[in-house]
Amino acid sequence: RAMSFYQSLAAWEYVTEHATDFAWGGGTQDYVLALKEGEAGAGIVTPPPDMSTGWVAYVEVDDVDATAALAETLAGQVLRPPFDVPGVGRNALLRDPNGATIGVAMSRHNFPVTRRQFGNEVYLSADRSFPRDFYARLFDWEFSKPQVDENHSRNKIAVQGQIVAATWDDSPLDNLASRWLPTIKVIDPLGSLRSVPDLGGVKLGQMSDAHVPQDLLFLEDADGELVCLTGA
């Protein structure tokens, strides 16, 4: 259902790849790359039984194995040790001290960095905390000074001066565990949000902030997974 949902919502196209030793569970299995305008910023796989479903944000690193080892010294966890994905690269799955899942990758493909398919990642925290030291030491990220608006705090995250993500210490959703969410770019965010119920999803709410140029629109897709929209 997710493939049809995002094809209609965000004009994604798909390419199916075949693995003889599938990295997410072994054996022979197909996996899907999601493309838009030549960018392949997402993949769709069926996770093994011991893993939950949902979006996983990935950070590009020079050495996946070293990064995974470092995470464990910074109060993080390795959920899935480093593994190779044929035609894609080497990955690992980590959990930060707040419990949010984050992937690390060293890519070995020719697709360009996604700029039209996705916006900046967003970190949502239900308890108004963000493991800043963990991410600063793990990825050498830079953080802006907190931007406070109506008692809510935001931080921008940069790599070599380029904004790549943001933290929000509140959300329009109740009882939400800390997590990274992608922001999918669409031409008409409000129009796309109105179409969500017809596509089998659920509209949840939005966040506005004087420091953020566009609202973030939150929804559940046709499989019940959280995601947000922003303008292209």
Predicted ranges, named:
Residues 1-39, 73, 83-89, 123-162, ...:
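Core segments of cupin and vicinal oxygen chelate
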Residues 16, 46, 167-169:
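Surface-exposed beta-strand edges and flanking loops
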Residues 19-112:
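Active-site-adjacent scaffolding segments
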Residues 31-34, 46-70, 72-127, 145-163, 168-172, 193-232, ...:
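Vicinal oxygen chelate
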Residues 50, 78, 137-140, 185:
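Short low-complexity stretches enriched in small and charged residues
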